[in-house]
C-alpha cells in the first residue's frame, strides 16, 4: 500500500482534560470499541490487580493518576488510531505540551457536573497556539449535571471556541434516557449496564417518530422543543471551522457505561485530519514524501522493569519505517541502523516491522537520543516547535549513602532526559539541584530513584526561585558574565548554561545589568 493510502487511514490524537473528568476511563473505552482490549478494567478498583491499561507505571497504579504520556495504537473500522494519553495532573504540563506537538488533533473531555476547569483552560491555550482541531466529549451524563446549554455557553466564553452539538442529551442523572444525534436525526436510548461489553444501543429513526413518544412519554415533546432551541442558539457543524481549531463538535455520554462513545469515535475517524505536514528549519515536510523522517517528542526510562531501558518516542512525519533501515541522526551528524523499533499498546510492546506517517515508534536509547532530535534519510533539516520550559521549583539532592554517588548521577541524568525534571550542576560546587514545573515531579523522582536505581536521597530547599537559559553571541561578554555571576550559574542536563535566580528582583537587576545577554524561559530542543 502506498504512503498516501497508509497516511489517509491514520488518525493521531491526544486526549486532554482536567484530572478526574474521566479521561482514563474514556481512553479504555476507545480501546474497547476498537477491540484492542477485551475488558475495560474499571479504573477505580485499583486495589484489584487489574489496573487501567494506559496507566502502566508503578507510581501511576498506586496513585491513580496518569503521570507520563502513554502511547496506544488500535484499529477501528477501516482506520488505524494512534492515541497519546497525556498526564491529567497539573504538574506534568511540559510532557503534555510536547505530546501535543506530536498529534494532529485532540479530544477534550469535560465533566458535565463541573464544566470548564483550570487545567482544561491551560491545555486549550496550547492547542490554540498550534491551531489543533478539537472534538469535545461531555462526560458523566448518568450523574447529576449542570444544564447542557449552560455548559456550551461556558465552553464558548471561557475557551473562546464555537460549539457545534452533534449529539444532545435526553435528561440527566438518574433520568438520563439517551442522546439525540443532530446530524443523523436519530435517537440512541441509554441502557445503563455492562461496563465491560460494548452494547448496541436501541436506535429510533427521526425525532418525530411516534415510537419515541412510546419510549419517552412527555420527555419526547420536551426533547423536540429543546432541539429547536439548540439549533437556533448554536453553530451547525462545519468541517473547515473544526480543522482550523475555531469550532468544536460536541458529544454527550457516559464513558463508564460505554454510552455515546461509539458515536464519538465514528465522527472522529470521519472528520479528524489524517497526519499533516510538519515545519522544519528549512521547509515543510509532507507525510506522503517517499523518504522517511521523524522527530523525538518524549523519552521514557525503565518502561520495562525487567530491562533497564530507555525508549525514545518518535513521531513519523513522512515516508515509511522498515525494520533494519538506516536513518540519519541530524544532531549527531551520523547514520544509525534501526533494527528493533517498538510499537505500543500501553505498556505492551512489540517489534515494528513497518510504520507510516502519524505512527509513533519507540527507539532503544543508550543516552545518545534527546527530546527534539530529528531523524531523516540523509536530509539535514530539523523539525521545529518542541519546547523546554524553565523550572519553577527547585530542590537540593543529598545522598543518604555517599557510596551511591555514581548510581545517583546515572538515575538523575536518565530521569531528567525524559524532560519532566531538569538536573542542574552549579559551576562552583559539586551539588546537584533538581528543577521541576510542579511538586509532584519530585515525588516521582524520589520514588523512581529508590525503586529503579536503589538510591535513597534527602531533598532540601535551595535558594533558587526560577531558572533562565543564558544566550549570548559575544564570547567576551559571556566570559565576563561567567566570572562575575558564577555563584548563580549552572549547566543543565544538556550542557546548556543556565542562570539560577535567588529571587525575582535579583533576576530583574541582572537582566538590566547585562542587556547583551538573553535570559530565556523556554528553549527549543
Swiss-Prot record:
Positions annotated to bind GTP: 17-24, 85-89, 139-142
Cellular compartment(s): Cytoplasm
Domain tr-type G: 8-276
Keywords annotated in UniProt: Cytoplasm, GTP-binding, Nucleotide-binding, Protein biosynthesis
Cited PROSITE patterns: G_TR_1, G_TR_2
Pfam families for the chain: EF-G_D2, GTP_EFTU, RF3_C
Record-linked InterPro entries: EF-G-like_DII, EFG_III/V, G_TR_CS, P-loop_NTPase, PrfC, RF3_C, RF3_dom_3_sf, RF3_GTP-bd
UniProt KW GTP-binding keyword: yes
GO biological process, one term: translational termination
UniProt entry tagged with the keyword GTP-binding: yes
GO cellular component, one term: cytosol
GO molecular-function terms, A-Z: GTP binding; GTPase activity; guanosine tetraphosphate binding; translation release factor activity, codon nonspecific; translation release factor activity, codon specific
Protein's job: Increases the formation of ribosomal termination complexes and stimulates activities of RF-1 and RF-2. It binds guanine nucleotides and has strong preference for UGA stop codons. It may interact directly with the ribosome. The stimulation of RF-1 and RF-2 is significantly reduced by GTP and GDP, but not by GMP.
Cross-referenced NCBIfam families: prfC (TIGR00503), PRK00741.1 (NF001964), small_GTP (TIGR00231)
Family: Belongs to the TRAFAC class translation factor GTPase superfamily. Classic translation factor GTPase family. PrfC subfamily.
Listed name of the protein: Peptide chain release factor 3
Native organism taxonomy: Bacteria, Pseudomonadati, Pseudomonadota, Gammaproteobacteria, Legionellales
